[in-house]
């Protein structure tokens, strides 16, 4: 049986270095999908690159922890009007305003359609905020309403005791291709683990990029360049084919 591998590059639109890295890894490597951050300054640059590379499937990377929201989100922004990683503390304290989050989700979706000229192929989120138990039902309902596939971290859902109402997704999502010690072998190990568990559709997350000034301020900077080098390796692509995987997108789910 043919197996589906989605190699999704997160953070399309974050900055030009990220945008160019994703396109490089798509054109000359194994990246087969990407997701766009609609509240970032370089989203229009990303959209222009998308027009030049129409075969690249583009989904939406819902953002609640970076930059400025598109709508008024008084419950989540700081004094500067910016979002941040304090979302988790507010979630634990039961202080999330789900009406504001739903409004922002709709605004980011509508902007995606306006900027890219089509709906996203699927939805995921920056820092996996859509897998928070308080937020997930809202996202799942929105995905069903729009007939969109959704990235599902099934391990996280199981750990949190979350109820999944048959979202359209892959059998497995792996965030393991991330960190300081990345190699081609570490990527292949993720696929070997999926094989051992009888999984036939898997998404692997990645963040390939060329380094620019914006990424220099990120806590995850130079490994993005390492990711780019690995993801454009001809040997890795050949190994994936030999393992019986076909590169694809959420449109194939």
Swiss-Prot record:
Q: Which GO terms describe its cellular component?
A: cytoplasm
Q: Does the keyword Hydrolase apply?
A: yes
MF (Gene Ontology): chitin disaccharide deacetylase activity; deacetylase activity; metal ion binding
- EC number of the protein: 3.5.1.105
Could you tell me which InterPro entries the record lists for this protein?
COD_ChbG_bac, Glyco_hydro/deAcase_b/a-brl, YdjC-like
One biological process term in Gene Ontology: chitin catabolic process
Q: Which Pfam families match?
A: YdjC
Keyword Transit peptide (UniProt): no
Q: How does it assemble?
A: Homodimer.
Q: What is this protein called?
A: Chitooligosaccharide deacetylase
Q: From which organism does this entry originate?
A: Yersinia enterocolitica serotype O:8 / biotype 1B (strain NCTC 13174 / 8081)
Gene assigned in the entry? chbG
């Amino acid at each position: 049986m043919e197996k589906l591998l989605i190699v999704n590059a997160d953070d399309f639109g974050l900055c030009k270095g990220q945008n160019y890295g994703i396109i490089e890894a798509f054109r000359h490597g194994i990246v087969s999908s990407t997701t766009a951050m609609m509240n970032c300054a370089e989203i229009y640059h990303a959209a222009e690159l998308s027009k030049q590379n129409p075969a690249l499937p583009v989904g939406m990377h819902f953002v609640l922890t970076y930059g400025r929201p598109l709508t008024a989100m008084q419950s989540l922004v700081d004094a500067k009007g910016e979002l941040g990683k304090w979302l988790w503390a507010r979630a634990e304290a039961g202080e999330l305003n789900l009406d504001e989050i739903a409004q922002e989700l709709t605004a980011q979706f509508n902007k995606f359609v306006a900027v890219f000229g089509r709906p996203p192929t699927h939805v995921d989120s920056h820092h996996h905020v859509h897998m928070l138990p308080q937020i997930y039902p809202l996202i799942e309902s929105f995905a069903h309403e729009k007939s969109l596939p959704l990235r599902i971290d099934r391990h996280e859902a199981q750990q949190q005791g979350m109820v999944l109402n048959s979202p359209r997704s892959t059998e497995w999502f792996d965030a393991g291709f991330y960190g300081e010690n990345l190699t081609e072998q570490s990527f292949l190990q993720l696929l070997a683990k999926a094989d051992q568990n009888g999984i036939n559709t898997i998404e692997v997350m990645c963040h390939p990029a060329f380094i620019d000034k914006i990424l220099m301020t990120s806590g995850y900077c130079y490994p993005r360049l390492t990711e780019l080098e690995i993801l454009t390796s001809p040997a890795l692509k050949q190994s994936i084919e030999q393992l019986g995987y076909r590169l694809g997108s959420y449109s194939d789910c």
